[in-house]
Amino acid sequence: MLVKCVLLGLFTLAVFFPRPDQLVRQIPRWKNPDSLIETNAPFLTEINQKIDEQLKPEATKNEEMKAVERFVYREIKYGYDWDVWGNTDYWPTLAEVWQNKREDCDGQAVLTASILRSRGFTDVRIVGNLSHVWVAAGTNEVMSPQADKNFQRVDGKLKVRLPGAKTFLLTWAHINKFPAARSLLLLLAVLILTLHPVWDVKQWWMTFGIGAAGLLLLYDWGGKYLQSSAVGASLGFWTGNLLVLLAIGLAYYTKRPANQPG
């Protein structure tokens, strides 16, 4: 059982983080997102000139932040980390964001925070939750802020709290954007390791079919939830999760030879 758990853990890491080098670099960035804020990049000068051209002389700080937000959204096209970097999550450096010109919310936040700090917003910080990352400076926030803040640095310390139900559902709904092939590979790995040493073809296809049906329902629910959170934890959400768990449960409780407890 221990060997199976280790193998499953390693395979799960490979599915979610196929680039281990990026994962190693990512760990300290998770601990201190604000460490990615830079102000000495040469290209920031040109960026600030372009932003200044869009601002009125009497622009307020909030208007200035909004101008930076518009610039970042215009210049950095949205792309999920698994499409851009391969890994499920990766916080890029400022140079990587500007070079690729394609990032998800964390990369967009890194660029936004760096621009703002270079413009004199000394209290700028990166804020986020389980599903989204944005930027705050004082009491002002940009980059589609959300009410539920799961992490931010306050007085030099990283403050972390558990996500609320809505944040959890929004995060889970993004399964709709996750490569289906990876989800199926993970399901296959779980079922193979759980069924072993039983190799009954009928049992195998039954459990895989049930699990795949569950994933299909979850992908469908996720797409609907991302269009409108009013969908909530609907029947598709509960049925999808239950079918995946049922498949794993059936695989685990499959009758095994007396001398092979699994």
PLM region spans:
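N-terminal Sec-pathway targeting helices
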Residues: M1-G9
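Small-residue-rich transmembrane alpha-helices that serve as helix-helix interface/gating elements
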Residues: F237-L246
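Secondary-structure boundary elements
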Residues: T12-E103, A136-K157, L169-K177
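C-terminal domain-boundary segment and adjacent tail
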Residues: G249-L250
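Cysteine-centered nucleophilic/redox motifs
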Residues: V68, W98-G128, V135
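Low-complexity, compositionally biased segments
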Residues: I51, L55, G107-A109, G262
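Alpha-helical transmembrane segments of integral membrane proteins
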Residues: C5, A67, T207-G211
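His-Asp-centered catalytic microenvironments across diverse enzyme cores
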Residues: L130-G236, T254-P261
